[in-house]
Amino acid sequence: MRYSTKRYYTHRATDDGGPMAFRIPRPAPTTLDPQRLARAGLTTFFRIADEWELDAAQQMALLGLTSRTTFFRWKKALPSALSPDTLERLSHVFGIYKSLETLLPGAAAAGWVHRPNAAPLFEGRPALELMLGGVAGLFLVRAYLDGERGGDFA
């Protein structure tokens, strides 16, 4: 017996020694609306930036922007789409934020990015300094915090 692969996954299992087929409904394909993704991502980023007390230059560096005009346009009216680079940067910022909220209580989480850090990765510098260096710095800080949480970085 054949089942349509368009609507269902087919799974074969044994029941009392014989094969038994059953259908599992396939989830409907989803697409992310680039405009909704941009709005949600930047709205969340700007809230985190306010909580971390980042100035415009720091926010621009984290977003990978060189144009102040673009930055302030984004703050005033969110763009209709974001580049893959910007989405990756946002993902790392959100991961860092989540880890800090898990590891540290309240205001300590927000202040962590500004405080000098004795861990070898930071060499006595604040994590923010490494984060401002680009995607690689964001990745390293996120991986460090994921390790501190005891989780794997994925």
State each model region's role.
Residues 1-154:
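Non-transmembrane "mature" sequence context
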